[in-house]
Amino acid sequence: MSNGIVIIGSGFAARQLVKNIRKQDATIPLTLIAADSMDEYNKPDLSHVISQGQRADDLTRQTAGEFAEQFNLHLFPQTWVTDIDAEARVVKSQNNQWQYDKLVLATGASAFVPPVPGRELMLTLNSQQEYRACETQLRDARRVLIVGGGLIGSELAMDFCRAGKAVTLIDNAASILASLMPPEVSSRLQHRLTEMGVHLLLKSQLQGLEKTDSGILATLDHQRSIEVDAVIAATGLRPETALARRAGLTINRGVCVDSYLQTSNDDIYALGDYAEINGQVLPFLQPIQLSAMVLAKNLLGNNTPLKLPTMLVKIKTPELPLHLAGETQRQDLRWQINTERQGMVARGVDDADQLRAFVVSEDRMKEAFGLLKTLPM
């Protein structure tokens, strides 16, 4: 017997898809399979749990049972999918299997842990489940090392510092947020973190970790070392593509999908952090929301392509929040930066003086939507 639409995953992407399908069809069979509890929580909240004194269970917004009842679902929590037989259209776990008409892969991405000696001592904060496993250690830690100065690393560094902890942030780039914007734009946030007491080790490399009687010894390059109580990996995300690979799907940085969110197999789709849409991986909430709306229509028989507008990315650093949009990582832009006490507006323009990107901070963030309208589509 077919289970209709089968979705592997239970995070934000999967839930958005369920809600959009149910807006259009109240009865089509929907089956969700996931390795976690399937309870709903807001993942961006993980960047602020320490300063707000929240436990993992405090993040739960809706239990799996409530979710199933509200949306008429068949749920299989704590279930690892072991194989996909794409030819027979069957999903398999160790103790069960499910026939599907259409299959959606929405399992997200896992935190990348740098392959250094002692890497097993590093913690990750990419899910409620991961936070639950280490919340006591993080709450009790006085000295914290964060590996990675990107978006998540910068958010966590500020949060742990606001909680009164001694924070060191290490990155091999010369500035924080290096993959998102040039140093002259990120310097305002970098200066604020330093003012707060975050010890920035830029152009530096973690070489290994070792447990000691009094904590964890982190060995760095240039014969340096520091001792801390906890180490957090914030060096990016990697989709777990082994399952899709065994199903014969085309893989690059994620599972490759077209504008219809369809993989190289006509009956299998991918969504969220797991998907690479026409060559782009977009691990942000707005593109996932828009993708879920389009995919719901297509699973129900439409043929609607995904058209993504230029979108804002929000960096949730409360002492100095930032919004950015456009091609902020382009190397050939000329940046016009206006700074004042209330905030910053940085405009990135090309050789023709066309606005291609912007970054705004603090009180100047209210200008973001006006600037967004002037960016080319």
Swiss-Prot record:
Residues of the signal peptide: none
GO CC annotation terms, alphabetical: cytoplasm
Keywords: Cytoplasm, FAD, Flavoprotein, NAD, Oxidoreductase
Subcellular location: Cytoplasm
EC top class named in words: oxidoreductase
NCBIfam families according to UniProt: PRK04965.1 (NF003437)
PANTHER family in alphabetical order: NITRITE REDUCTASE [NAD(P)H] (PTHR43429:SF3), PYRIDINE NUCLEOTIDE-DISULFIDE OXIDOREDUCTASE DOMAIN-CONTAINING (PTHR43429)
Protein name listed in UniProt: Nitric oxide reductase FlRd-NAD(+) reductase
Protein encoded by which gene: norW
